[in-house]
Amino acid sequence: SLATGAALAAVSPEEAARLGKDLTPMGAEMAGNADGSIPPWNPEGTKVAAGFVPDSGNYIDPYADEKPLYTIDASNWQEYAEVLTPGTRAMFEKYGADGYRMNVYPTHRGTIRPDWYYANTLKNATGASLVADGQKIEGNLPGLPFPIPQSALEVMWNHMIRYGEDFNMDYDVYYVGSNGKPVLSTTALSTSVFPMFKTPDEPVGETPWTMLRINYKAPARRAGEILLVHEPGADYTEGKGRKAWQYLVGQRRVRLAPAVSFDTPNPGVAGTTTYDDSFIYNGSPERFDWTLIGKKEMIVPSNSYKFVFENKVEDMLGEKFLDPEAIRWEKHRVWIVDSNLKEGSRHLYSRRTFYLTEDSWTAVA
């Protein structure tokens, strides 16, 4: 849970020495599990699929020839309830009779990072610490800040400043109403750059983790709008956190946008989610108390190349749920973090539980 006052201590040199031995350079368990359903970490990374064109932006599924190991559906989901998140269990309870199912494929653990990132992560294990009630990291280099986490907030910071490489993304956002009809709510171009990973030898300090720009193209009422967000790499204390600006066509000027955060409804998805729902979670952790539940084997979405790169979004939007054939599920070890709204704080959600895969530290549920 969240420590107050003194800094949360880094781990000992003896503990940090496990990185690259029984733990991967990023702190995951190197070995597979007892029954072989989770393999050992693959330090070679994901194989490049035949036909991939560098710089094309279109990644080809390297596992396209694989078949599901098994399918979880209305007839058997309760046998797997222990390894399903509450969200997927709820989907079976509500939509199992309508054909909701999960195709579970072989697990792949090909998450790798540059050597300098591993070296910085090793230094961070003994050198980085949380201060200011978990709102700030001191002593971290551009790498994973807490490969051997001692608290819930250390786990969440690993997700919040996870590794990224610059990219552009054209995307469409749809929401499906209660009538089962999809409605286009946004067409946009998103550009993300990651300044803190461009200076690997310098402490993060005030260097941003990411700078995000979104140019809205549709619907017509939003065409021409621009959103710019600078997200900190180490410091959410007062005056140091997220900086956001908006350009609104009708006003013809750029203005600060402090409301682009927390539980403000996100117009990019027609207000059906909050700004801090994006990427499962983002932004300052200040409004919640955080509890580390532990690590557990669970079935989570992973390696869904078909969904992201091959299929048209509109073809995958069912009346009640996404096309199950487009989603790939795998068994992974995940960190589980629970959060409860602090007394005196305001948020649409009073409690949130997050699931982060051990290899990438990315929140997946």
Question: Could you describe each region identified by the protein language model?
Answer:
Residues A10, A49-F52, I60-P62, Y118-V131, ...:
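Charged/polar interaction segments and conserved charged motifs
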Residues T4-A6:
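N-terminal signal peptide c-region/cleavage motif recognized by signal peptidases
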